[in-house]
Amino acid sequence: MSHNTFGHLFRVTTWGESHGPALGCVVDGCPPGIALTAEMIQVFLDKRRPGNGKFVTQRQEPDAVRILSGVFEDARSNGQRTTGTPISLMIENTDQRSKDYSEIAQAFRPGHADYAYFAKYGVRDYRGGGRSSARETAARVAAGAVARLIIPGVTVRAALVQIGPHKIDRSNWDWAQTEQNPYWSPDAAIVPVWEEHLEKIRKAGSSTGAVVEVEATGVPAGWGAPLYAKLDAELAAALMSINAAKGVEIGDGFDSAALTGEDNADTMRMGDDGQPVFQSNHAGGILGGISSGQPIVARVAFKPTSSILIPRETVNEAGEEIELRTKGRHDPCVGIRGVPVVEAMTACVLADAFLRHRGQTGREHFPLGASA
């Protein structure tokens, strides 16, 4: 299987399967001299860790990360720091139940990657989906923790803004609330509505979709590139690569189609510091594929989890029509744990964009009035 690596200068290769002994990633391109410990990565893995709530998978994984390479500590380094060599991170799987999948070893689960993998490779890991499992995203979150250290002036944070048909009230948006409920919701009032919906879904043995919104602040104007390496194209590709992601929009996204030119254009005035100030952010912080200095805003739509308890019609490898009921432990709403994954992928894209921009121009950005 190819294409397990993403990024250009900041490159991440993930490895491992849902029911294998371990999974992890190799991060290449991290500059030397950056303080890095397992504890700094673990903070973010704990946000994604399964078994933390009633409406996520009950698979109990500690997701304890080990740094196998790429760091060094001696009397001169003032703590453990990156060396500039590949950073290898490993997370052991400790709570697999492969027997839950023995009855579907030859069946293609509707809505899952089973059939597509089999059609391409002629072989597949049916135990939890192998590489197609959301378990793979633990490695992405670990890589994202490293990426954040390369861009310390940038803040990346995400929130759940919709579960099923129920959207937040944006007038209630409060980032502090995302740490006060298990759904990372910025709107406290929507939480009981979501819980009622999720309880109905859980009792029915079904699943539901969700939308995650991510915001990156502190990104200066100038990161990215025109045409074929647009920052929004790189970000959209990274977010679409997340398991169960089915749609991405930047800024106003599809809603911009209903606007007029005068409504959609982000007008500018001069600020007291001599730099332009935008009066709106319909573009989501990216213009012409290059960051504008505005907050970068994107949303990701996650489909309902394909593995559900309700019997469905499908076929098996022998070409027989069968009825399938999936066993195992699965997320009624995979979008809940998608929040830290969306943050991680955004951080990786921005770290890569920063390194590429610095390599091309030698500086972070060109303030208005500055000479090249």
Curated annotation (Swiss-Prot):
GO MF annotation: an example: chorismate synthase activity
Residues that hold NADP(+) according to the record: R48
Cofactor: FMNH2
Major enzyme class: lyase
The reaction(s) this protein catalyses: 5-O-(1-carboxyvinyl)-3-phosphoshikimate = chorismate + phosphate
Residues that coordinate or bind FMN: R131, S132, S133, N243, A244, G288, K303, P304, T305, S306, S307, R329
Family label: Belongs to the chorismate synthase family.
HAMAP family: Chorismate_synth (MF_00300)
Quaternary state and interactors: Homotetramer.
The protein's name: Chorismate synthase
Species this chain originates from: Caulobacter vibrioides (strain NA1000 / CB15N)
Gene: aroC
